[in-house]
């Protein structure tokens, strides 16, 4: 991709015969824009604006938006919000599945290479730091546990409780156990699955060399780090809009699916709280208030992670609400 006169051109828009130009075309088609930031910070709109300006395709990097049954609560961009721009990897895993970062990476690498092959720009957008970090920096090739191993661990969790499994983990992988919350069911079970499957502690796997899924990619990274006061207000306002858009009906349908509470889709922001209301355990006002609180807390954790962990070429210090200078800054780096 090339910039001339403030406009964005793709290689097929130009003609030249030199070998240097052809190599430049090859490298240009290996660019990937990554847009990261906390929930409600304007990532999706920025991704659409970049994609529209640079003939791009938006690739989802949000671990809740990979599930199809909570489009309102997980803020999957609507047709109107997409504005005619192609989006991919939204709703790709059934809600009955525990999609892994490795599975997402395989899909993302395939989509990014497809987008390159079409002469377009991949615009990866999301708030899941693990997805983005593994895409940019590579991942440890930890084998997935076989179904019988996962079943064994799940049975033990149901019979003994997660704190007991955490105690068991400490006997085989003290390093991992020390860094995990004893009540973090997903990570405690995953660490035990890895050990039972491979005989090697997860902490040892993490010390092994990283493997790049896209070694040929050159990333242009943007992160949005708005003040928490601005983010808090936007989180609360957006949840009110979600309620008006049918979030409660969405959770009611999810409840009818009778999925295990341990699945990621059942942990989306707002789902546990509204489920409590539907079960008669709290008032709707209490459920909404708690969901807003948890959303703000999650946004704060995301903001902290991206501030400390993600190196970026462009940093926005306010929520994105449209700005031509930001788009131009991105173009200069392509």
Language-model features, listed with the residues they occupy:
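Phosphate/pyrophosphate-binding catalytic cores of soluble transferases and nucleic-acid-acting enzymes
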Residues: 2-4, 9, 14, 19-334
């Amino acid at each position: 991709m090339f910039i001339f006169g403030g406009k964005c051109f793709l290689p097929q828009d130009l003609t030249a015969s030199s070998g240097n130009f052809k190599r430049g075309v090859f490298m240009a088609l290996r660019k990937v824009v990554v847009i990261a930031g906390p929930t409600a910070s304007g990532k999706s709109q920025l991704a659409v604006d970049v994609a529209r300006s640079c003939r791009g395709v938006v690739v989802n990097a949000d671990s809740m938006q990979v599930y199809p049954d909570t489009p309102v609560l997980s803020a999957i961009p609507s047709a109107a919000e997409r504005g005619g721009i192609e989006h991919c990897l939204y709703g790709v895993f059934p809600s009955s599945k525990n999609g892994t970062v490795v599975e997402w990476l395989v899909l993302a690498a395939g989509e990014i290479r497809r987008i390159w092959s079409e002469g377009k720009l991949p615009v990866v957008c999301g708030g899941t730091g693990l997805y983005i970090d593994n895409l940019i920096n590579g991942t440890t090739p930890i084998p997935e546990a076989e179904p019988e191993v996962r079943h064994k661990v799940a049975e033990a969790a149901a019979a003994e409780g997660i704190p007991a499994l955490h105690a068991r983990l400490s006997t085989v992988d003290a390093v991992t156990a020390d860094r995990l919350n004893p009540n973090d069911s997903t990570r405690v079970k995953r660490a035990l699955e890895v050990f039972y499957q491979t005989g090697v502690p997860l902490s040892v796997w993490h010390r092994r060399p990283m493997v790049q899924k896209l070694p040929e990619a050159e990333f242009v990274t943007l992160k949005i780090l708005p003040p928490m006061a601005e983010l808090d207000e936007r989180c609360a306002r957006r949840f009110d809009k979600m309620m008006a858009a049918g979030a409660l009906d969405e959770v009611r349908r999810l409840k009818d699916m009778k999925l295990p509470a341990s699945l990621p889709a059942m942990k989306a922001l707002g789902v546990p709280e509204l489920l409590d209301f539907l079960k008669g355990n709290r008032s709707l006002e209490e459920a909404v208030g708690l969901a807003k609180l948890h959303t703000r807390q999650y946004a704060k954790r995301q903001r902290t992670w991206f501030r400390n962990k993600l190196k970026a070429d462009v940093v926005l210090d306010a929520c994105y609400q449209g700005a031509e200078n930001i788009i131009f800054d991105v173009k200069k780096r392509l």
